[in-house]
Amino acid sequence: MTRPVIALLLVLAIACSASANLDGCLVMMTSPTEVLPGGTYTFSFWVQNESQDGEGIATIQISFPDGYTIFEGTMACDEIVVGRPSFDMYIPPIDHTAIWEDNNGGTGEILPTEGTTVYIDATVADVSYGTPIFWCVQGDGAGDEVHEVCGCIQVAINPVEDLSWTAIKALYR
């Protein structure tokens, strides 16, 4: 019997120029490392601000593929210092996007050289193989353009047969 296993490949796409405010900022999925269709998992993403001119990250968006179910009540983030980051966390209606948004209107919540982890639970779609999870971070508007950096994390399928030599050999291909 073949059981599909989705391997989450951490493909980092950083789309910013050398002089951009958010140059070097990134989002990386740290868990889970693999999932099964129909399973519910806590997805965690490391968000790092490497702005070269002082811009803070004010908004983080993680967009899951169609068919995923995300659970707003499970959204969380790690504090960098007590009371910060202080994000409003929500999921817009009719969307598969989780948003962590600065709620005090000041400088961004993740300052240059800082990073934090954001979390959300999601049920994996049965038919989303090869569809990426997209991410965007928006800055607080300080300094020069570019105030947004986006990328994706590729989701791929790796079908293997349970309890067989084929399954074991597939790990080494």
Give the location of each predicted region:
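Positively charged n-region of N-terminal signal peptides that target proteins for export
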Residues: 1-4
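Bacterial N-terminal signal peptides
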Residues: 7-17
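Low-complexity, serine/threonine/proline/glycine-rich extracellular segments that form mucin-like
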Residues: 21, 34-82
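A surface/secretory-pathway sequence property marking extracellular, secreted
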Residues: 59, 66-106, 147-153
